[in-house]
Amino acid sequence: MADPTGARATRHAAVVACLQRDGLSALLVSHLPNIRWLTGFTGSAGVLLVGPAGMTLITDFRYASQAPQEVGPAADVVIERTNVPERLRRAIEAMAPETLGIEAHVLTVREAERLSAGLRSRVVPTSDLVERLRQVKDESEVTAIRSAAALAQEALAAVLPTVAAGDREIDVAARLESALRLRGSEWHPFPTIVASGPRAAMPHARTSSRELRRGELLLIDFGAQVDGYCADITRTVALGPADDRQRTVYQIVREAQRSSREGIRAGMTGREADAIARDQITARGYGEAFGHSLGHGLGLEVHEGPRLAATAEAVLPVGAVVTVEPGIYLPGWGGVRLEDDVWLAADGPALLSDGRTDLIELDL
């Protein structure tokens, strides 16, 4: 990613400004995506102590070579071979913050109690301090998400022509996940959803061994990851020629999704964004069949802020990347969902995925 050192310095300064605003002397960061955002460290274990003068990453022997390479000058790196909690305690005592913020949504009560026992610092719970900063993406982050979306779409385009009679949902998922990896996806941000026929009425169906059947719909929800950043895309296709009901439901979802991705703006609330699609689907008689929110933030995590939901009153910030994914789910029949990734730029929404939602009818 471009100029990681400069970006990390800017992010550190933003966290310090939040600490000063909230009356905190330092922050203990335990959530790994937050640590990666601040330092570039991609390991599976570590804690980060953030203060006005700098940051200290404490991790274990497994990352003795990796951590310094990834972090560079963004933070001091401490490799602790035996007792990371004790080494963290010594680092806090050396910094001597009067008040130490902790990520209350990450640390367990037991971990927080152990940490605070014997510390002179007053331990203060915080909520989503770093996550709120992460909602606003810089150019390099947007580029990574766009790249992830592009390779995801290339993978799907390669796999759809291979879908054949006798395939199981899990066969399609396996070929898609292989195609994603072969095109450069670092990992699958979530288990690929391939749901056919009546199973597509389950928004988060677990991919099964059910065989695909001509005349049904096939819902595919999948993602890719580039430089740690996620794309999240859903397409629904017909297995053979679509019938009138399938076309009607599909078109309702397609129109609602297009209106939403074109009408969403930074500065509106998550509730207002959700209402664009929800009102259209409700007006067509399917409001009760659209039971989930319109979308969510996207970045280092596949589900992050901001929320696009009927109960979300927070304002969508300039620079956020969100999914737009309305759906209609009819038990016993199936479901349709269409999902694209949208960047809320200052001058309006910009698609990061291709937005191609013409109904595809596979020759099964």
Predicted segment positions?
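Active-site neighborhoods and metal-handling regions in enzymes and metal-associated proteins
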Residues: 1-364
